[in-house]
Amino acid sequence: MLTVDELEDKLIELAFAEGIGDGDHTTLCCIPEDAMGKSHLLIKEDGILAGVELAKKVFAKFDPTMQVEVLINDGAHVKVGDIAMVVTGKVRSLLQTERLMLNIMQRMSGIATMTNKYVELLKGTKTRVLDTRKTTPGLRMLEKQAVKIGGGTNHRIGLFDMILLKDNHIDFAGGIANAIDRCHNYLKEKNLDLKIEIEVRNFDELQQVLDKGGVNRIMLDNFSVADTKKAVDIIAGRYETESSGGITFNTIRGYAEQGVDFISVGALTHSVKGLDMSFKACE
């Protein structure tokens, strides 16, 4: 499996290939090769800044002579009018890296900002907000980094770092007990140490899990707030609990107050708006 650094390098290479192709002809025809300049990153919307470290890598990979002065770091609260960084170098390099840097930082900052709003709603409870695998293909590591920068907690990264028995797995395996048994047999055979989470859709399935055991976390899928409270009481701390399914900004606090350990929110990554910012020439 690729490391985070390797994934970032591949992303940057692909992004430059699709964006510049055989050349930025607008810049090449208008800007002399030896022209030098300076641009700053202007924040145009309040939020949480994210993507600074990756932006630095974008500049360094495209043109190692570019000088980046970071004024505001990842995770900081920013407001309209703030200057997050100043970049000095060849004007051609400034122009050709502008859009990729903005695409990354706007996307990551939007996710961090959205996540932080959910985190703030959970203050005073023990509940942590989780992301999901509902991410942009190829950008999962970046988007999950942004969730962490915003104060959220990463769920599993992919299909390889946790067992998550969902409804289809259970149905195809012939029921909850069979599915759990097969997981333990597989993990033993492959000498793997992975946590097991199982999704339940109703109280009958919940009781089957409690009777069987052998899991680390129980996901309460599409339970109402009232049923969540009942389920948490029944589980009584024997397993970690996670609420999932249709939970929104307006309803998340109610679920957290029922005592669940985690709440997963797909909207952190699949329905987010980028944070407004621009990269402008300056003196």
Task: For the regions a language model picked out, list residue spans one by one.
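Acidic/glycine-rich phosphate/pyrophosphate-binding loops and surrounding catalytic core
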Residues: M1-K212, R217, A226-I234, Y239-E242, ...
